[in-house]
Amino acid sequence: MKTDRRRFGLAMTAGGFAMSSGWAAGASAADSKGARIRKVEVIPVGIEFRTAFNIGVGQVGGKGVPAKYVYVKATTDDGHVGWGATTTVPNWSYETVEAVVGTLEHHLAPLAIGRTAFEWNVLKKRMDETIRPAVSNGAPFAKSALEIAFLDLAGKMTGQPIHRLLGGKLHDTIDLCYAVSIDEPQAMAAEVKRWPACRCFKVKVSGDADKDLARLRSISEARPDIVIWLDANQSYQPIALERFLHALPEFKNIRCFEQPVRSEDWMGLARARAKSPYPLAIDEGCFSSFDVARMARLDAADLVVLKVPKSGGVTNCYKSAVVAEANGLGLLGSGLTDAGVSFMAAIHLYSTLDLLLPPELNGPQFLTDMMIDGMEMQGATVTVPDKPGLGITVPEEKLRENRLKLG
């Protein structure tokens, strides 16, 4: 049975490559215009958090403290502009804002010069040859920003939204899941009541079983109508995890439990899966489609958490989704408190997939400014754009006003 699953996964991976190549070939009409990228600008930007955001590995955002993003502006010789962006969360993954800027300016952006916007397969190949993947993938956050700019350009030059470059959307709107930062039980209960339009929350837990159970009780009493997606962000040790898992059946509104153990400990995740009353999801331990395939062979999890930055871009993230589905793994969508450009890239991608829960894209929840114009959102529901490219505009003057000074 496992052999068949592996073969099917490999076949689907090959199909994913073929589909992507086919789109590049089909873009010849716009390509014949001769529009080639002549300039790539890298812009580090700070955007303040409204409130603190604490997860299992520590604080990833503080009130009034700028979160650090990197925007990419790619301009063609006929004046078309494509935007890309990525977040940086070095206590979640290793790419600092300085590393992303340096990688883009010195290694990746030069690879884009002289290319058309439709050569993203060539771009990905050259990026992986320049910054070689090690075990999983290499410098994925930086690569993601540049690929999004290519896709935005390709969409604008063909008059198509990004979701159509991926085969078209399955959903016209996307309901969002918001996050509940680790805090005292009463404060976490107040947070879920603060967003009445949101019906699904990713509840962050700390690795302290007794405190986490008290938090869950408080949240469940405050909003018995919600669905809970648990996320430990690698914070649990084996003995505490066993106690926590044993107590979880008390809560009937939990749908899954994400990354309870360290990202490197796949066998520990498999052991936790055997004892968990709810499906287990892998996130920090699964960056690439190769990771998905290995995890499926180990039977280490039930669900895969997709993130555009950790995958190295939209098309690599889509490839991970294909491999996961081919191996019988459910799909969850998430982000890293993405600001507007990378947030919208995820919206386009997730509109083409059948996710098991609303994607956890919490930028509108935590950030004081999404740094885009034209996003349509009511309550916790985003309309998937049908305008070309990302379907939004970037307020460039505001972006430059919030430029970070590095070094």
Regions found by a protein language model. Give the residues of each.
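N-terminal export signals
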Residues: 1-2, 6-29
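Flexible C-terminal active-site loop/helix
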Residues: 10, 35-49, 64, 337-407
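Structured beta-strand/loop patches that form or line metal/cofactor-binding pockets in enzymes
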Residues: 31-92, 364, 368
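Metal- or metallocofactor-binding catalytic centers and their adjacent structured scaffolds
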Residues: 34, 39-43, 75-157
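Conserved, mostly hydrophobic/aromatic
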Residues: 79, 146, 159, 231, ...
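Active-site mouth loops of central-metabolism enzymes
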Residues: 173-185, 206, 281
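Alpha/beta enzyme core
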Residues: 189-198, 244-251
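Catalytic core of soluble alpha/beta enzymes
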Residues: 203-342, 371
